[in-house]
From Swiss-Prot:
Keywords: ATP-binding, Cytoplasm, Kinase, Nucleotide-binding, Transferase. InterPro entries: GK/Ca_channel_bsu (IPR008145), Guanylate_kin-like_dom (IPR008144), Guanylate_kinase (IPR017665), Guanylate_kinase_CS (IPR020590), P-loop_NTPase (IPR027417). GO terms for molecular function: ATP binding; guanylate kinase activity. Essential for recycling GMP and indirectly, cGMP. Residues 6-184 form the Guanylate kinase-like domain. This is Guanylate kinase. Pfam families: Guanylate_kin (PF00625). The gene is gmk.
Amino acid sequence: MTHSTGTLYIISAPSGAGKSSLVKALTDAKPEIRVSVSHTTRAMRPGEVDGVNYHFVSRETFVKMGEHGDFLERAEVFGNLYGTSQSHLQQTLDAGHDLILEIDWQGAEQVRKLMPQARSIFILPPSLQALHQRLTNRGQDSDEVIDGRMREAVSEMSHYVDYDYLIINDDFAHALGDLKAIFRANQLQQKRQQQRFGKLLAELLG
């Protein structure tokens, strides 16, 4: 059995929909799935670690990296810049690992144009009320910032139609099961299985 090239997964959601928690639970259960660590100019939040959650850089450094063509995609969200390293992404996929990009719809649009084979997943909250409550419970943002995120969420959620899969995060365990099912189904696609089991298939078919 040989390893197949990994699949790139784009996962997007409005802030507070539970995307990060679902991705962490998925990769805790399946450590062979990797998560791309984006570069950002936003301030580090309590509990975050540079190089783990994000590569935290200055706006000047980010702009220079962009000028050098280091980013596969980049976007500005709430006044902060975010970008995905092109070289690291390709190395991970070539090594046979499935790779998750946690990016917004703007970044997803850019990636799809460059890598149309990528699979995309959008996560929605069960209601606007639930979304507001989750943002409030995080205790990370002021009321003003939360109000801004809620306004932005309506615009963001309208882009779910551009994605391959849609998950409603009402019950966390159920949503996690849906996410795992998407990854498992894609691993069983004929082309990927052919790459993995080429020798076996040749023997079976004589």
